[in-house]
Amino acid sequence: MNDGVLPQNNEDASVEATLHPVGISFSKSSIAAFAEEGISEIGIYVYMDGSLIYGEKQPLVHGAIEVPLPLGENLQTFVVANADEVADADQLSTAVIRQNDNMQKPVYISEIIGFTSDNSVKSLDVELKRLVGQAVFAPVESQEEMDGIIQFDALDITFTNVGVAYSVKEEKAVLEDVTVRTNRESDFGAYVYSFPTENNGSRTSVDVAYLKEGVIVNRTNGSLDTGIIFKSSKRSVVHMEILNEDWVETEWESMIEEIDF
């Protein structure tokens, strides 16, 4: 993969002179979102005839960045923030954004922008929008009920059909199941971000495994069909009675053993 250095021709010293600095500035809403999420750098990817000529992460300085580009060319670019990886970026047609954090943080991306790098283009105004949607698992029990739970001390929440990677060109997600472990400290709640799944024709369900001291002691008696389709900047909340015995394979009462002591 090109690390952001333009191709050089050692036999032609004039190549460097043909580079044209193009500024990239961001909207106030984008800068505000970056500050809120603690984002301090962004990735810029520029393509000529579909092939990468510049791909680099840059620190944000006053919300503007300057990129050296070849003069007089028709180019395409996209900008991404808070992504763990942009894989297969050598070609625009194969560039895929991936997350490696169990989908626990949002990703921001611009549209693919076409422009000509002539002297009249001093700067590109870029707006990054939150690409991901979010699903939240929220138990409905009261705090008093939470405090009285002795049957388990953690939950593994599995969200099915989560968009864990995203094709920039095709605007389509790669789907996998994602499991998030939660416990009493977070009131047994959990969440996951997902790239949009509208173009995948799939819906998300939830499976819950109940654990005590790291061992599964119960689980839901089937996937809970939530009907969730992930959409950019949309949050869906799944409310569940985690103590309701109608939802689990084994009644909690039957798991309690009384012995003399």
Identify the role of each PLM range.
Residues 18, 61-63, 118-120:
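Ser/Thr- and Asn-enriched, surface-exposed coil loops between beta-strands
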Residues 84-123, 214-245:
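Structured interaction patches on ligand/partner-binding surfaces of diverse proteins
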Residues 1-26, 30, 137, 233, ...:
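Bacterial Sec-dependent N-terminal signal peptides
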Residues 31-91, 146-232, 254-261:
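Tryptophan-paired
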Residues 127-148:
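Surface-exposed interaction/gating patches
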Residues 125-132, 192-197:
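Conserved "repeat-terminator" motif of extracellular CCP/Sushi domains
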Residues 16, 21-23, 43, 78, ...:
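Beta-strand secondary-structure signal
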